[in-house]
Amino acid sequence: MWTRKSVLSLVCGALAATILPADQVTPSAWAAKHLVVPDGPQAGQLWNPDQTPQLIEIMDHLSPESPVNEVVLRKSAQLGATTLGIAWSGYVATVDPAPMMIVMPTLDSADGFNREKLNPAFEASPSVARRVMAAASRSARASTVRTKRFPGGSIILTGANSTADLRSKTRRYLSLDEIDDWPLDLDGQGDPQKLAYARKESYDATGDWKVLRASTPTIKGESRIDEAFEAGDQRYWEMPCPHCGGEQRFEWGTKDSAHGLKFRREFPHQAHYVCRHNGCVIHHHEKPAMIRAGRWVASCPGPGRYPSYHLDALSSLFAQWDSIVADFLESKDDPTRLKVF
């Protein structure tokens, strides 16, 4: 028999379910359950955090429950880090609706990102597809090629070469991608990165804005992402040696260093790693377990420093050390090719 108290309890429970805070699920947990990866080794499958464990902490700082406003990722190419921006976008569309902007180097690259990665991921992920308005609709609220609309917010895709978008849109969340490829000056109106930051000024008073900057570095001394990384707390993926347990990050060895990645210049390169603590020889087949046992450690913590992360090919589960060495030897005399490392 229904009583007034039981009915009231049921109604209150249903109401509470609609207004629970977003901390009920983190971005990484959401992605593992809902995000279908559009390309790469995991294409067509749910995102597997076990394949890129380094992204978990970075993703979760993009949750509204994290007090962090800024996150920086300095990365090598082809590490699966594109998933970071896609996952955050899907999370915003389904869990934490708000106005968001994704800024690529150019409008053309923004269109390519949407066509090849973001749109396929959204269409393949049912929870996102249900929330994002269809582009085919004639409604004024329909999505377009460069705008994803959903209840409570929208995601605008644009380029760092677009004066109109960088000067006119108010956004709570900004994902600034490949910032080293952005122009230094936009049509005489200044640094596009500063113009992008101005889009979130309306949220400065509430402090609930977030900015993700991610890029492969270009030329040393001229790199935006290097500067951003060094202004942060400079986190590296530290892993325990499988033989002595000493924590360390993977580094390239040199002729003067006893530790690091060692290899023959001739094929086969026989790449292996020498532990910095006890000189233990670590073989490639031991690398996956090391990476999965790793954690982010800040090398330069301090007041006012935001989380900044360094992720390179040596600690990627997708890359073979011998292949990395072969590519490095081909690229070592070309600074523009070396940036992928």
Language-model segments: what does each one mean?
Residues 2-341:
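Phosphate/NTP-binding elements of NTP-utilizing enzymes
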